[in-house]
UniProtKB/Swiss-Prot annotation:
GO terms for biological process: regulation of carbohydrate metabolic process. ATP binds at G155, D156, S157, G158, I159, G160, K161, S162. Homohexamer. This is HPr kinase/phosphorylase. The gene is hprK. Its cofactor is Mg(2+). It comes from Enterococcus faecalis (strain ATCC 700802 / V583).
Amino acid sequence: MTEVVKIYQLVENLSLEVVYGDEESLNRTIKTGEISRPGLELTGYFNYYSHDRLQLFGSKEITFAERMMPEERLLVMRRLCAKDTPAFIVSRGLEIPEELITAAKENGVSVLRSPISTSRLLGELSSYLDGRLAVRTSVHGVLVDVYGLGVLIQGDSGIGKSETALELIKRGHRLIADDRVDVYQQDELTVVGEPPKILQHLIEIRGIGIIDVMNLFGASAVRGFMQVQLVVYLEAWEKDKKYDRLGSDDAMVEIANVDVPQIRIPVKTGRNVAIIIEVAAMNFRAKTMGYDATKTFEERLTRLIEENSGE
């Protein structure tokens, strides 16, 4: 599933100024996250013109255009306006050539402007569009922000995922999505999760029903999206099954083509799963900062064995 981005949504989310744009042009669809800077095209070379991309004008493009004759400038600007060109965006709050506005009006293409630098604007455009246009898949589970770490709680139906998430919310953590989490790959190492719009801020608790977390706990108890950094899989305790007691098993699970660390927590009466997840999140963060309690224990054990063997 891929979302659609309209020009007016880009304007609202990136606080862009609309220099020209009517209802039809602001409803044009952006189909790719790639951004084009039409430098060669201003010289008249259109062989490889990416007409279906947003066209970004920085100080180099504007300065070059200003040195052209008005008739030549208008001709080039008209050639830049294709049927599927989403919009023109000018950075640094630069003055926009009248010929660009004229050509845009003739072809129903919006002209937008931003006060920020070209490189920064390019980064913001790419980041926003890559996130919105990324292919999304859905996974079953509950995504919670635990101490700033995106923890995806998974497990069999009825194991207590939502109840555990509710306990975490009561302890000051934040809900991103319950039951169904829409995930997408942001880059090679990053997967992001968010709720479907219809389930935003909602959590289902058996015996109570649907709860609006933001209404009950406030805006600080929810957030719109989060990187999935750790997967916690809840499973029913089995008496004869051997569980990892040292934390030396580095299991991974693939989500949206990204490998994410996973830990499995056996659930049984008397275990406070919410607190265990809190500790798991803190321990995971400690590992990413270079401290591994398991390795420390193994080193101590090795030293003790060596000392005893030398006596």
